[in-house]
Amino acid sequence: MNNVDYDLLIVGGGMVGASLACALDGQDLRIGLIEAAPLTVSAHPGYDDRTLALAQGTRRIFQTLDLWETLAATATPIRQIHISERGSPGFAHLDCRDEGVEALGYVAEARLIGAALLAKLPTLRNVELLCPARLETVRIEPDAACIDVRFADERTVE
């Protein structure tokens, strides 16, 4: 078993884990990203053909991560939102023009978001991709947390 020290381990290379890894690029941290599936869009269950509504805050995060330019080409702007309940006289209507923004949010395919994130991961300077691999055990010791990782080829690291 090989011993490797990381400042931070991210378990899961889905949208949240991959976004976190991208956001921490350039920090003075040695980061490992553990993912059970191969890091390809077709292999990852989270990067499927579902469409997701992205808030303006998410767009700003993707912009900061230098991903929005790639996603903007296929994302559909949400310009109006109508909220009502069947049988109830009340409703709410939101319009991007009233808010002074280009869009209230965007609709994008999970597969395309995944493709943008996965294309960026190998370029990160301080993130080591540990995949396909799975977290085996976690032990808390006085000065560190020890984690055993098993790769698909049965190699292990601690």
Predicted regions mapped to residue ranges:
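Short glycine-rich hinge loops at helix-strand junctions in the catalytic core
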Residues: 28, 66, 126
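Anionic group-transfer/hydrolysis microenvironments
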Residues: 9, 37, 111
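N-terminal Rossmann-like FAD-binding beta1-loop-alpha1 element of flavoenzymes
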Residues: 4-33
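Glycine-rich FAD pyrophosphate-binding loop
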Residues: 25-50
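Conserved N-terminal helical subregion
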Residues: 4-5, 74-158
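N-terminal FAD cofactor-binding segment of flavoenzymes
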Residues: 46-86
